[in-house]
């Protein structure tokens, strides 16, 4: 509960000029040796109707003088207790500190408000649970170099502490402290300064790092592989896209080799690649292009590398195709196709590798991206004996319609050169036939055509099976026509096994009475027919 007087003191903003010193003293609005106190707004006070101070500055002054009443008033006017503690420390008013100690909380929160190193250290001493390391760490954070200098001899005895303070100074970007530690103390791991500088893109800290590195090399006879270190820095700077950092490193030596430019490409920093690309040999540029493909670099980076090679990549076509297929990175294929001159079409080469090694999903994506016909892919799949691909692509391309699929696969068989590929296509045709329930009267014409197809391609077992299936449809006249037609095919193409199967079916039809001796004689009158069948059985009948 506030007294009426305290409520007035807290909220009164305008004082009558007629109030004398005695009245102001009774109201608690008089500051000895300074004059009347008047609140202005929320953050300022007017002293003796003339001087304006911030509430916190006035609070610091009052605490320094040990004026408890004014301190109490200014705290009532929402002054920050931390400034009272600072003032008390400046005036050695420990009685006042003791009075408010329980309200202070964490004394470390006061430290950022202090500029004087001595007061800073005295304030830190208020935290009885802290040690010298805590003081030094806060001295680094708040740029109190003189405190570090004061305790230099003590710091020097603890190498781990030196490293902690150095790393903290780097992270806090306190360059003056970093420089002092670098020149005055032994730093075990100097690399921290470069790590922090690169992480925060702090060029001034990075430059300071090299200053300290050269000092360390020249004064400590340190066993440091500077060349290797410079390459690491170049690689890290390239990965971060920090060209100015790379140029700074190059002042001390180092070389922008392919590993450095690999990093720039991996992290998509084209400008760095553009700056150095003309300094590396053609073979390195070729390797960079392959790396760009593998990391799926953007269009501008690929164009930069291709342009540097004058779009001539014939020496690395195999590696390029392999990289495109393995890393599913097809942009370079498009760029090479877009050229008016020196156009290079890698679609077939990439597609062949995809068909050989990659999944159906990858292949479909490529087909759609480059508008590749399904027939083209199926022929490649047949050469590589990838039955599953043939089936899946056929279903997707021709809407899983059996007759349409069979029709297109039959057409492909005629142009398929490797016999193994042709056999696989015929196998797929028969597989579709067997799994699609086509053995119905409505499909009679298509089965007839398929049987003649098997005969033309000397597919013996499948021909025999489909003839048996066709006979089961109970179309005797058409079956006779099929058999006679296929016999003619067998004789013309010199397929003795097909002719033998046909001969068996003809005998069967003859014994059933479905074909006459005259019809058989006419069929067997073909030139060289006697080479494929034995006509004695017919003569004996």
UniProtKB/Swiss-Prot annotation:
UniProt xrefs under Pfam families: DUF249
Keywords, comma-separated and alphabetical: Early protein
Swiss-Prot/TrEMBL induction comment: Expressed in the early phase of the viral replicative cycle.
The UniProt record lists the keyword Repeat: no
Protein role: Plays a role in virus cell tropism, and may be required for efficient virus replication in macrophages.
Family that this chain belongs to: Belongs to the asfivirus MGF 505 family.
Protein name: Protein MGF 505-10R
Species, as recorded: African swine fever virus (isolate Pig/Kenya/KEN-50/1950) (ASFV)
The organism's taxonomic lineage, starting at the top: Viruses, Varidnaviria, Bamfordvirae, Nucleocytoviricota, Pokkesviricetes
